[in-house]
């Protein structure tokens, strides 16, 4: 998204979108993509909205910038998407300010802003973390419904495996900033191959067990990453070579 501070540095890899590397785009080129083709929902809805601006204007603004529509048409489309995300009395509430909404309502508004231009990719960064369990379920159901209506792809960033099971088609498990296992949701949950994935699944509470298994040790310091496999020190199945070299990333099936 190109939203990090100027002193942030990408040390390797690429971010491919439509056959082009986003890391090579200028800020002006990214402004044409950001919010239009790729949108993002941030973690905390309480701080994601401008407190001095009516929510209708905040929803309409991306349309005026990216779709080149006039204010009246943008406002009408903002009202339509506000109804779509389930804000009651949208005709009146479109003129309200963020502080007049609850946390769950603010997250719905943030989702409306992200989806108003019908992006191809929606990045959702822990979008339900700051919400209570009941509102979490409502927001997740809303996102699944909107995904089908708008036909957008969602990259869902979360530490909640229950959310993963309910939302995902494919899952990338990350450890120390690296993808260590990738597959369909069924493969990850029912046929995991990496010891870290085993540890995550074993740490989930179940009705059939009274004991939770914890992964031993602590995560590595990413400012001073260890040589070799970053999970080796916590992996009871690690070999000596893992302390020296990264294990290869290999396929066990067409999708895993």
Regions found by a protein language model. Name each.
Residues 10-21:
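Conserved ABC transporter NBD signature motif
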């Amino acid at each position: 998204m190109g939203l990090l501070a100027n002193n942030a540095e990408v040390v390797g890899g690429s971010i491919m979108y439509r056959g082009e590397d986003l890391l090579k785009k200028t800020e002006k080129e990214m402004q044409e993509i950001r919010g239009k083709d790729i949108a993002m929902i941030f973690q905390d809805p309480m701080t994601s909205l401008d407190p001095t601006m009516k929510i209708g204007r905040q929803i309409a603004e991306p349309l005026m910038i990216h779709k080149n529509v006039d204010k009246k048409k943008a406002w009408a489309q903002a009202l339509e998407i506000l109804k779509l995300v389930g804000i009651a009395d949208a005709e009146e509430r479109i003129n309200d300010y963020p502080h007049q909404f609850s946390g769950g309502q603010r997250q719905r508004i943030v989702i409306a802003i992200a989806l108003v231009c019908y992006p191809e990719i929606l990045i959702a960064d822990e979008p339900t973390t700051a919400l209570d369990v009941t509102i979490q379920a409502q927001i997740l159901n809303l996102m699944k419904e909107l995904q089908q209506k708008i036909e957008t792809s969602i990259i869902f960033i979360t530490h909640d495996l229950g959310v993963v099971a309910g939302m995902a088609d494919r899952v990338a498990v990350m450890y120390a900033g690296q993808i260590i296992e990738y597959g369909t949701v069924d493969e990850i949950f029912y046929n995991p191959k990496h010891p870290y994935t085993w540890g995550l699944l074993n740490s989930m509470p179940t009705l059939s067990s009274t004991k939770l298994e914890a992964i031993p040790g602590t995560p590595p310091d990413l400012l001073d990453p260890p040589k070799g496999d970053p999970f080796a020190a916590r992996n009871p199945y690690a070999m000596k070579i893992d302390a020296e070299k990264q294990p290869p990333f290999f396929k066990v099936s067409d999708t895993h």
